[in-house]
Amino acid sequence: MNNNKIDIHFIDRNIDEFYELLSIFSKLFEWEEEKYPDKDYLVKLLENTSFLTIVAKSGIEVIGGLTAYILDSYQEQVSSIYIYDLGVKEEFQNRGVGKSLINFLVEYSKSNNIQDIFVDTEQIDNEDAIAFYRKTSFDSETKVLQYTYKLIGKGNHKKL
């Protein structure tokens, strides 16, 4: 790791930084292909005020980041944030970058009426992610079942 300070910031509309982050996610999460939606779709996603994209940079290199969604409540006037993906290049892991990304999101949340942040992770073959989240200062861990209704792509969805 070079001696550059780690800079953490929102991407806003920087599509190049977003592509760099997606490339990191692709390698870390072993996506089948490094293939993404077209540029117009990704720009529209970045313009969505409920979609948050935060990157960590060392010098000019994107070394990690996270994507998250703001979810507004209908029970009270607060919101939650769901962390969709979080990843740091392998050579920068275990150096506080992931924790700094979480802390950046926490500070943003405190000043934007966000009541909580939550994230989920696969329980099988995902020991590193589980260990990482357990090292952060979370308030609770809940076992949750997820049910997915596949509507596009493989298989036929049955009517309920």
Task: Specify the residue positions occupied by each region the protein language model found.
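A short beta-loop-alpha structural element at the N-terminal edge
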Residues: N3-L21
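Conserved GNAT acetyl-CoA-binding A-motif
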Residues: S109-T121
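Active-site rim helix/loop that mediates acceptor-substrate recognition in acyltransferases
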Residues: E32-T53
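Helix-loop element at the rim of GNAT/NAT acetyltransferase active sites that forms part
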Residues: L22-K35, Y74
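A conserved beta-turn-beta hairpin within the catalytic core of GNAT-like acetyltransferases
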Residues: L71-I83, Q93, S140-T142
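Conserved acetyl-CoA-binding loop-helix of GNAT-fold acetyltransferases
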Residues: N94-E107, K135
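Conserved beta-strand in the GNAT
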Residues: V55, E61-I70, Y82, G87
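Conserved beta-strand-loop-alpha-helix junction that forms the acyl-donor binding cleft
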Residues: F118-A129, T148
